[in-house]
From Swiss-Prot:
Annotated family: Belongs to the eIF-3 subunit C family.
Record InterPro entries: EIF3C (IPR027516), EIF3C_N_dom (IPR008905), PCI_dom (IPR000717), WH_DNA-bd_sf (IPR036390)
GO biological process, one term: formation of cytoplasmic translation initiation complex
Name of the gene encoding the protein in the UniProt record: eIF3c
PANTHER family, A to Z: EUKARYOTIC TRANSLATION INITATION FACTOR 3, SUBUNIT 8 EIF3S8 -RELATED, EUKARYOTIC TRANSLATION INITIATION FACTOR 3 SUBUNIT C-RELATED
Principal location: cytoplasm
Subunit organization: Component of the eukaryotic translation initiation factor 3 (eIF-3) complex. The eIF-3 complex interacts with pix.
Protein name per Swiss-Prot or TrEMBL: Eukaryotic translation initiation factor 3 subunit C
Compositionally biased intervals (Acidic residues): 11-20, 162-186, 209-235
Compartments reported by the entry: Cytoplasm
GO cellular component: eukaryotic 43S preinitiation complex; eukaryotic 48S preinitiation complex; eukaryotic translation initiation factor 3 complex
Amino acid sequence: MSRFFANGSDSESESSEDEIQATNFNKASAFQFSDDEEEVKRVVRSTKEKRYENLTSIIKTIRNHKKIKDIPNTLSSFEDLTRAYQKALPVISKEENGITPRFYIRCLAELEDFINEVWEDREGRKNLSKNNSKSLGTLRQKVRKYIKDFEDDLSRFREAPDQESEAEDEVVAQESDGGDAGDDSDAGVKPTEAAPKAVKSAPAKAAPADDDDSDDSIDWDSDSESETESSDDENQYQNMRERFLKRTTEKEEKDDDKRKDKRKEQKVKIRKRAEDDEDGEWETVVKGHVVEKPKMFEKDAEIDVPLVLAKLLEIMSARGKKRTDRRLQIDLLFELRDISDQHNLGTAVSVKIHFNIISAIYDYNQKISEPMKLEHWALLLEVMQSMLKLLLANTDIIMSESVAEEHEEYVTAPFYVRGCPLAAVERLDDEFVKLLKECDPHSNDYVSRLKDEVNVVKTIELVLQYFERSGTNNERCRIYLRKIEHLYYKFDPEVLKKKRNEVPATTSTSVDVMDKLCKFIYAKDDTDRIRTRAILAHIYHHAMHDNWFQARDLVLMSHLQDNIDAADPATRILYNRMMANLGLCAFRQENVKDAHHCLVDLMVTGKPKELLAQGLLPQRQHERSAEQEKIEKQRQMPFHMHINLELLECVYLVSAMLLEIPYIAAHEFDARRRMISKTFYQQLRSSERQSLVGPPESMREHVVAAAKAMRCGNWQACANFIVNKKMNTKVWDLFYESDRVREMLTKFIKEESLRTYLFTYSNVYTSISIPSLAQMYELPVPKVHSIISKMIINEELMASLDDPSETVVMHRSEPSRLQALAMQFVDKVTNLVDVNEKVFDMKQGNFFQRGNMGNRGDRGYNRNQNNQGGNWLGQRRDRNNRNRNQRGHHKNNQDRQQQQQQQVQTIDEE
């Protein structure tokens, strides 16, 4: 091997070195190393190691800046961190399968907590410098925007922040060492090739666990200045590439030794703890900080009420702290309850422990927007009902939030316990709704969760009984409202049977229960929100059971429509649901006009699904931000409380058809005709614009086809389009008494088709026989007579009834089609002329109409005297006005002549 790669000894002279270099001159001489560089061992680092090392160094810098509250540098370091993470993304997606490293998520969580802490400290913010204050606002905005992509990872991290990955263990080890090598070391990546180093012998107990580590460690004797090193180098660097590889320093080797020693010590401690266990059973060892289960009481301790309460206070004092094991806290409380029951410390102590267990279960889920786990839900129901049964069974226990902690009494009756079962049951109800929203509504999970409503209502009943015995009016109103909200949307068939006298009059129905609960709230409530929600639920329940007049009177007397805009979103949603159900009730009770008025505000917007909180429209996704969408999803109603939107739209369109089609026929040639229903009118016009219309398929197409048939007076085709097998399945079978609704619809279609027929063809007939109309529309003769009489009285139809002959005599006062079109044409031409005259006046100007015109005024006056250059525009306007007056006078003469002819006819008949 060439002597270029060998190190010369200290005894060699400089002249000999020069000779060696001169004789062995080649290309490799440019890469010759000094003695210091040769001592450094070199290894190849992967891209993952480089990227992770860059991330961890920036994270450590951010932590240092946070300690001294250097916010501008924290901001710049955060920007560097985001750029470094962007560079590391390809490595993360390849090596970690796209899973964000835990140490990076921990850094984001700590940074978010730091910003929130500084931001909430208002006094401290006032003392910040201008630069720090500005940087804090910028940093807060950037962090909030950036962590939106890591919401799921952050939520999982916050559920178990104590668990540390191997990467984080190395980061902690580096920070604890405090050496310079720790600043630049890699956190989260183990070296691909361990360097040889000396390792001390492990303890005897830990020897089996350290076999792998001991295999990797080899003892090397090194002397950098001996001649053997040069010979070793000669043998070691057989390859040119090996010469240029970076090697770890001795300092880094020592750091690695320290880390491994710490891990070994931790393993030894865990193993000793397992060996010292009396039962000798296996224990699952979790990563991260291991917390020993505290002992409840000493063996010889005398367990009494003060001792148990002190232990309870000790357990609950850890509530809300960062490293509290919430599962262990619940287990300790259950154990404490069992100890209390074994030593018969009294029911009051048991109630207190029960209430703290409920609080601990609620605290387990840190994110209040997410539903709790099913195991905790079942446990919560059980503990809640157990506590309430104890309260109801012992009348000498008073549990209230007004009881101060120093005034609690557990030894002598009456017992006073601080707590609020009402707040607990309200939270229970909210958690039940969250569980329902989390499930797929078309799965069996939703059905199984819905079965829990029986237990929830039973729990509410227990709380209601307790507060009826000892509670304020405000507390009773709150618990009554909770019961109302579980009752108002449920249909009770006993109500309709009671109306038909099919059940005894003493039978208690849901309407009676609602009346009792709501009337108490009307009388005793002092908050507007509870009373408003009770009224809305009461109206909804009345409307569901066809109590149209009671529901309508409640709406009119409460004036809800005047101040509902000032209510909270949940109350506005309930108001929309009430109006929708009220419209359905009016339709079932044959009040088509009222049904249309109730539903028009919901349907004209085009988004009834959002207004009723039954889902979000994907078409409007760009109109709302992610935060708004999250809030709106939290407001959604559970699926079993939804109102069928297709049924709602069908009722609205059918009501609009029954009102709009006769109105269109009556005002066919009226240029100023207004639209009763804009939505229905648009559907009708879009169908008329189509060149080829096929048979109807959807619900809307069926209604439009029925409307076209009604315009021709064909009631049979109209009824067939509205009431058929497909429409029955989609819409009408959803009503409670569907046969009665179908009969009502057919009757209305006949009546409105008759009205449309008379409006459309009145100018064709001289007289029409009433029996023939009754036969044509399959209506009783008195009904036809009544319809025509109303039309004549309301001046909708210019005709008279001849009772002896049972005919309707038309008066032909309405213009024919040609006359109506001619009158429309004249009006439009007149309007066009007026517009042109105004435009011409604006172009000419009005200079000569001013008072001070000088000599030109005399000349103009002379011309006017000679009828030259007169006001010809004014003359034309006067002429047009005279023509209009003549047309009006001519029309008045015609009307007068017709009236005289009618009087003559009546005299002749008499």
